[in-house]
């Protein structure tokens, strides 16, 4: 499984981002433009929403939950990249 700093995401053309935080966290802070919301605990039931044949970037508050989800998806054969630092470290614009 790969990791990059969350602020590198803005340099990537058309990234597929999954935000694994809870709904209340998204309402409080917003998320990166275009991110798909799939809460961490629901990921196993939503695998059909996650593309298998392209890079998928996983986002959370600080990078810990996203690391766990990325490791899980990596074991299932997904091409995943953890966004280190999460929303707390992200310096770009957030969308609600």
Feature annotation, model-predicted:
Residues 1-16, 23-55, 64-96:
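Rhodanese-like catalytic fold shared by cysteine-dependent sulfurtransferases
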Residues 59:
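Short, surface-exposed ligand- or partner-binding patches at beta-edge/loop junctions that are enriched
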């Amino acid at each position: 499984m790969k990791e990059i700093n969350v602020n590198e995401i803005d340099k990537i053309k058309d990234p597929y981002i999954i935000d694994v935080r809870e709904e209340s966290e998204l309402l409080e802070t917003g998320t990166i433009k275009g991110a798909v919301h799939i809460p961490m605990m629901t990921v196993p039931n939503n695998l059909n929403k996650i593309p298998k044949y392209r890079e998928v970037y996983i986002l959370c508050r600080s990078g810990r939950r996203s690391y766990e989800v990325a490791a899980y998806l990596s074991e299932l054969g997904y091409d995943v990249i953890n966004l280190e630092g999460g929303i707390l470290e992200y310096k770009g614009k957030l969308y609600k």
